[in-house]
Amino acid sequence: MSPSIVFTGGGTAGHVTPNIALIKEFRKEGWNVEYIGSVSGIEKEMIEPLDIPFHGVSSGKLRRYFSLKNLLDPFKIVLGIIQSSLLFYKIKPDVVFSKGGFVAFPVVVGAWLNRIPVVAHESDMSPGLANRLSFPFVNKICLTFDAGKKYFKRQDKIEVTGTPIRQQLLTGNRMKGLELCGFNSSKPCLLVVGGSLGAGSINSCIRSALKQLTSEFQVIHLCGKGKLDSSLVGVEGYCQFEYANEELADLFAASSVVISRAGANSLYEILALGKPHILIPISSQVSRGDQIQNARYFQGLGISVVIQDELLKADVLLQAVQDVMRKKDEIDNKIKALKIESATDKIVAIIKEQAHVQTPRIV
């Protein structure tokens, strides 16, 4: 009988894309793979093309602020634990891999109740609330950054691995990317990535600065679902998409500079591709500040140019783009020195070890 694994994680693309990299590896090796996510989260849409069983369970939001909805969330989480536990009793996987996000906690507890080993992964400098709550119930947690170790008591559960990267991102074709946008090689390209849900402040700033940007660059703009601007269709040197999936590798390959939020998974991929970049982290007023931590760390290394979201204006962005282009060679060398590579093989080995289908590693 083939070994089996259940993946969980969702809420944003950052809690799903590393799972996709791992899912493809396990399927290649003949494992039975299933996914547990929230009923209406982005993970269902992203996992669907992989053609694996998807199970939706109830989940709370794990908010850090007061809301009347917080009163209902404990009941949603308990229901999610019950649903997950029943699913695991039926599926009986050898191991569970959790990428975090609010759906992950009830799934992790459901696995623990069924005595199924759990491996979790944390992408950010400091762990999210779901992974903090899940930590007592996991066998191992893989961290992207060594700085995250201080937030956990049981150091024997921790492995610093990096982040899994979708293999296809590393095989992009520049000319295909240019053709997809109707561009040519006469001007460098800027790739603007606002995240899976889009970013209103980035979208507005790019569009207000479009005339100046397109005088020197060709602009590829991933603006988020439902956030295309019909008035800009056909503007020379500007191509907008709601979201890019299979074509993302080619769009990256076509780009000289990337403008992005500072989510750890996106940032790790940008670094692995060796792209000079500008980071615009989500404000701490609407997040736990993890993106600000990520951005500051790489800004301190002289690698990332950072603009705070509340200071984002057309003139500030244009100056940042000029700064990156002026220091491009220096930034290229600093990124190369990091030797960033995909953690897929490392994490696959840890998962197999916990599932007892591989001889324990010597670490």
Swiss-Prot record:
Signal peptide as annotated in the record: none
Subcellular location: Cell inner membrane
GO molecular function: UDP-N-acetyl-D-glucosamine:N-acetylmuramoyl-L-alanyl-D-glutamyl-meso-2,6-diaminopimelyl-D-alanyl-D-alanine-diphosphoundecaprenol 4-beta-N-acetylglucosaminlytransferase activity; undecaprenyldiphospho-muramoylpentapeptide beta-N-acetylglucosaminyltransferase activity
GO biological process: carbohydrate metabolic process; cell division; cell wall organization; lipid glycosylation; peptidoglycan biosynthetic process; regulation of cell shape
Pathway: Cell wall biogenesis; peptidoglycan biosynthesis
Membrane topology recorded in Swiss-Prot or TrEMBL: Peripheral membrane protein
GO cellular component terms attached to this protein's record: plasma membrane
Domain of life of the source: Bacteria
Recorded catalytic activity of this chain's protein: di-trans,octa-cis-undecaprenyl diphospho-N-acetyl-alpha-D-muramoyl-L-alanyl-D-glutamyl-meso-2,6-diaminopimeloyl-D-alanyl-D-alanine + UDP-N-acetyl-alpha-D-glucosamine = di-trans,octa-cis-undecaprenyl diphospho-[N-acetyl-alpha-D-glucosaminyl-(1->4)]-N-acetyl-alpha-D-muramoyl-L-alanyl-D-glutamyl-meso-2,6-diaminopimeloyl-D-alanyl-D-alanine + UDP + H(+)
One Pfam family named in its UniProt record: Glyco_tran_28_C
InterPro entries: GlcNAc_MurG, Glyco_trans_28_C, GlycoTrans_28_N
Keywords: Cell cycle, Cell division, Cell inner membrane, Cell membrane, Cell shape, Cell wall biogenesis/degradation, Glycosyltransferase, Membrane, Peptidoglycan synthesis, Transferase
EC number: 2.4.1.227
Residues annotated as binding UDP-N-acetyl-alpha-D-glucosamine: T12, A13, G14, R166, S196, Q291
Function in brief: Cell wall formation. Catalyzes the transfer of a GlcNAc subunit on undecaprenyl-pyrophosphoryl-MurNAc-pentapeptide (lipid intermediate I) to form undecaprenyl-pyrophosphoryl-MurNAc-(pentapeptide)GlcNAc (lipid intermediate II).
Cross-referenced NCBIfam families: PRK12446.1
Record family assignment: Belongs to the glycosyltransferase 28 family. MurG subfamily.
Name of the protein this chain belongs to: UDP-N-acetylglucosamine--N-acetylmuramyl-(pentapeptide) pyrophosphoryl-undecaprenol N-acetylglucosamine transferase
